[in-house]
A protein has these predicted regions:
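NAD(P)+-binding Rossmann beta1-loop-alpha1 motif at the extreme N-terminus of oxidoreductases
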Residues: 1-67, 92, 128
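Rossmann-fold dinucleotide-binding core
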Residues: 99-183
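Rossmann-fold NAD(P) dinucleotide-binding segment
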Residues: 54-118
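Interdomain hinge/lid region at the active-site interface
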Residues: 172, 181, 216-280, 300-301
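Active-site-proximal catalytic alpha-helix in oxidoreductases
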Residues: 133-134, 138-141, 162, 168-199, ...
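Hydrophobic beta-strand scaffold residues
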Residues: 30, 50, 118-120, 161, ...
Length: 304
């Protein structure tokens, strides 16, 4: 297995910062960039190197990790005027951890292969806590050479690494399925909490009972405490699920596969975004149900 020493990392957002920090903790030299310069001091204080462009992060790098919002940003990071591929050595591995459509990922894999690079389609799950603790799950696909090159990085960022196939895009298929379930679970948790509260049960009691009952889920246990506290500081924003469930529906259209539950969950997130909640934590969808029903799930209730 080749030894990786210098890593370029693009995207120090809520999850990206934790992921990049885990690489530092595991002995990698990480040069990073983010569009938000306010993260620069914290990154440098943690031992990371700061760059002004994706191209600069890739100079002398053995690999680059991309953790940005969408496929448009991935394209800009890799192929833009100051894109990473202007500096990245041929034969290096490109790891895209962003949530993108399977068809996009498949096309990107072909494009990178033709340009002389290895590619790992490696979306992640586990939230901010998982990123900060190095306990993410990674659902990755790519050729043997890409896995051999990228595995040390994956192991630094995750405790569960699933190799789901050799074809680029299969990792994104699994992430798409995960996001279908995650989005539906969040909206159902919000609906259920508002429903039970409106019917007269103390929301804290309701959460305690359901979290230890068959109707619970990982998302219920993780997001309902945010709802109860009225703390909608974004760990994963409403707008993220507008995008991700949109990808789910796009894949369904490509396959001619009906996705009625995903479509309904998507519309709830769209409604939340339209109500001005897009930048808030995805658990803020509970506000829609509170406003519709008069229920007060949150200890500090507000309309927006």
């Amino acid at each position: 297995m080749p030894e990786l020493k210098k890593i370029g990392f693009v995207g120090l957002g809520a999850m990206g910062f934790g992921m990049a920090s885990q690489l530092l903790k595991n002995g990698f030299h990480v040069a990073a960039v983010d569009t938000r310069s306010e993260v620069k001091p914290r990154w440098i204080d943690g031992g990371g190197a700061w760059c002004d462009s994706p191209s600069a992060t890739a100079i002398d790098a053995d690999a680059i990790v991309v953790m940005v919002v969408n496929s448009e940003q991935v394209d800009a990071v890799l192929f833009g005027g100051n894109g990473a591929l202007k500096s990245l050595r041929k034969g290096s591995v490109v790891i895209v951890a962003s949530t993108v459509s399977p068809s996009y990922s498949k096309g990107l894999g072909k494009q990178l292969s033709e340009a002389g690079y290895l590619y790992l389609d490696a979306p992640v799950s586990g939230g901010v806590v998982g990123a900060e603790s190095g306990s993410l799950s990674i659902m990755a696909s790519g050729c043997d050479a890409a896995f051999e090159a990228g595995e040390p990085l994956l192991r630094a960022m995750a405790t569960k690494i699933y190799r789901v196939g050799a074809e680029a895009g299969l990792g994104s298929v699994v992430k798409t399925v995960n996001q279908l379930l995650a989005g539906a679970h969040i909206t159902l948790a919000a609906e259920a909490m508002a429903f039970g509260t409106r019917a007269g049960v103390d929301p804290n009691v309701l959460y305690e009972v359901i979290s230890h009952s068959a109707g619970s889920s990982w998302m219920f246990n993780d997001r309902v405490p945010h709802m109860l506290a009225g703390d909608f500081t974004p760990r994963s924003a409403v707008n993220i699920f507008v995008k991700d469930l949109g990808i789910v529906l796009d894949v369904g259209q490509e396959l001619k596969f009906p996705l009625p539950m995903a479509a309904l969950a998507h519309q709830i997130f769209v409604a939340a975004a339209a109500a001005g909640l897009g930048a808030q934590d995805d658990s803020a969808v509970v506000k829609l149900f509170q406003n519709l029903s008069g229920a007060s799930v949150s200890q500090t209730r507000s309309e927006r």
